[in-house]
């Protein structure tokens, strides 16, 4: 092989460099206005809450007004979602989130990240949701194992005025752990930060966008301290070339990302007050809490290839606070002026709401006190809701004890009448109740492993008929139904198919000889237990310190 002379080689390199520079369509020294709107973790809340908060009808009114305002100033809007459209409201869940995606179409979403809860249903349902949606589902790091091909588009390109904007989608690689393993037999979740580096290089080489934004479902953790969760947006931003993304539109941790100081979010953000987004390594990071409670608004000025944020706010969507007056009476009042609901959206969504509501409002039982299922409790401590759910599974399977991850409990039940809707809000995932017969030694090994799951994660375990003291990775005083575990005895454990197949990092038990899949859906099992045991006494299920960590 002959080598090119140095002068010829340099000339060719220079020519190649010239041909690979971005074909800039924007005008030099002109300032363009670009507004990025964003939501995340919608979780089925297409309709207003019982207090008249959020909902897609009010969201459309708000977004339409912002579009009009920005257009009058000569600017452009891009509307993104950080994912998790699925799971959380029965009227939506029973209809596979069809009303939610059709409502998002009407609002005019441009793209969304694929969230972990998009996999709460089989892939066939997810593909149907893609057909309903008129915007792309983006994820660069989800692959089909058998083909090595991506399951979704890695990015989408949008032109706003003369500016070429690339939007990358990324999904937490925790999905394989916290999702239903039965749906992931041929799916691989690669490390999103590593995939982002590759995609950014590909974009800059081939598409040559003026701006790159990531819409992600990875979580925001202060200073990158992600604990037992997979690394999130902060960690990724720090790992990328400085400023290689203009911003990250996030989701998954379900926080208002409003910084109190460097690397520390506000603990109790007050709706309607100023919100300072995070910035790491020259990359803005935003997140709009959950459920459509807010629409995030980031106003940028683009000039000569540079994106400068000039304004950011979280706009509450009819959020209310409870106020108690001097006479002892209380009411819920708006934080900010009311946003009217869009009539066209109401016309679209009302039939869906009525269809779902009719199936859910029938009373199935009652309880005399609160059954605690709030996220801030079930991921940190034992609760009476956990005990009720496991009692139902134990009763159905004839088990000696029960275990499940706290992240599978999604809501509380207030004192009073209980409807099927209440049950489905608590257990919306449609997991199957299973059981396994294990030796006492296997029980000790299993519970020792599960007890290592840390608080502040969905993996934190809820127990029933189990007591122990955990210290330095070992269990002492381990008892089942008040009796010390006999290594030679056989015990039956009830749990969910999700945990049995390794969900949330739990030891797999579906390969054990004594494993049985009952085929009964968790919410149906809980519903029948409530029907048979009502009125429930909430205090009878209150944990009494049976399990403790030192």
Short names for language-model regions:
Residues 2-22:
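Gram-negative bacterial Sec-dependent N-terminal signal peptides
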Residues 52-65, 101, 105, 188-196:
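Short catalytic helix/loop segments, enriched in acidic residues and glycine
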Residues 74-76, 109, 208-209, 398-399:
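Short, high-confidence coil segments that cap the C-terminus of an alpha-helix
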Residues 26-48, 78, 86-190, 226-359, ...:
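Active-site-adjacent helix-turn-beta-strand microarchitecture at beta-sheet edges
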Residues 174-179, 223-224, 413, 503-504:
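Short acidic/His/Gly/Ser-rich catalytic and metal-binding motifs that mark active-site loops
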Residues 60-77, 204:
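Signal peptide-proximal N-terminal region
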């Amino acid at each position: 092989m002959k080598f090119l002379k140095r002068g010829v080689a340099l000339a060719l390199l220079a020519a190649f460099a010239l041909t690979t520079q971005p074909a800039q369509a924007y005008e030099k020294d002109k300032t363009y206005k670009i507004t990025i709107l964003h939501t995340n973790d919608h979780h089925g809340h297409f309709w207003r809450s019982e207090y008249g908060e959020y909902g897609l009808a009010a969201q459309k009114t708000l977004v339409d007004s912002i579009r009009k305002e920005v257009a009058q100033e000569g600017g452009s809007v891009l509307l993104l979602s950080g994912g998790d459209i699925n799971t959380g409201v029965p009227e939506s869940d029973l209809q596979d989130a069809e009303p939610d995606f059709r409502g998002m179409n009407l609002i005019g979403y441009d793209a969304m990240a694929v969230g972990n809860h998009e996999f709460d249903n089989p892939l066939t349902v997810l593909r149907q949701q893609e057909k309903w949606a008129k915007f792309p589902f983006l994820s660069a790091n989800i692959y089909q194992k058998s083909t090595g091909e991506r399951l979704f588009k890695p990015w989408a390109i949008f032109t706003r005025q003369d500016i070429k904007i690339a939007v990358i989608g990324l999904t937490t690689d925790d999905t394989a752990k916290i999702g239903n393993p039965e749906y992931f037999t041929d799916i691989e979740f690669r490390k999103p930060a590593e995939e982002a580096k590759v995609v950014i290089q590909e974009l800059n080489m081939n598409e040559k966008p003026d701006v790159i934004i990531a819409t992600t479902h990875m979580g925001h953790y202060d200073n990158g301290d992600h604990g037992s969760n997979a690394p999130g947006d902060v960690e990724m931003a720090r790992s990328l070339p400085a400023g290689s993304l203009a911003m990250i539109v996030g989701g998954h941790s379900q926080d208002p990302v409003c910084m109190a100081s460097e690397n520390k979010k506000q603990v109790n953000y007050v709706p309607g007050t100023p919100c300072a987004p995070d910035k790491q390594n020259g990359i803005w990071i935003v997140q709009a809490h959950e459920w459509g409670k807010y629409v995030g608004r980031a106003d940028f000025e683009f000039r000569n290839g540079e994106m400068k944020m000039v304004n950011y706010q979280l706009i509450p969507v009819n959020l209310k606070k409870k106020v108690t007056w001097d006479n002892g009476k209380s009411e819920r009042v708006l934080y900010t002026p009311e946003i009217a609901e869009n009539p066209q959206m109401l016309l679209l969504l009302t039939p869906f709401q009525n269809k779902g509501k009719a199936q859910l409002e029938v009373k199935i039982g009652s309880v005399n006190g609160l059954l605690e299922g709030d996220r801030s409790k079930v991921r940190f401590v034992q609760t009476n809701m956990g005990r009720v759910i496991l009692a139902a599974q134990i009763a159905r399977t004839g088990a000696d004890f029960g275990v499940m991850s706290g992240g599978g409990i999604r809501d509380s039940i207030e004192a009073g009448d209980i409807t099927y809707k209440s049950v489905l809000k608590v257990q919306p995932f449609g997991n199957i109740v299973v059981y396994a017969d294990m030796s006492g030694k296997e029980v000790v090994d299993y519970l020792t492993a599960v007890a290592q799951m840390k608080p502040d994660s969905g993996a934190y375990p809820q127990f029933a008929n189990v007591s122990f003291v955990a210290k330095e990775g070992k269990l002492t005083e381990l008892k089942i139904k008040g009796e010390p575990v006999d290594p030679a005895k056989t015990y039956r454990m009830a749990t969910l198919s999700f945990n049995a197949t390794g969900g949330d990092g739990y030891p797999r038990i579906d390969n054990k000889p004594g494993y049985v899949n009952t085929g009964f859906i968790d919410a149906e099992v809980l519903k029948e237990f409530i029907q048979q045991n009502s009125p429930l006494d909430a205090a009878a299920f209150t944990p009494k310190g049976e399990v403790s960590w030192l």
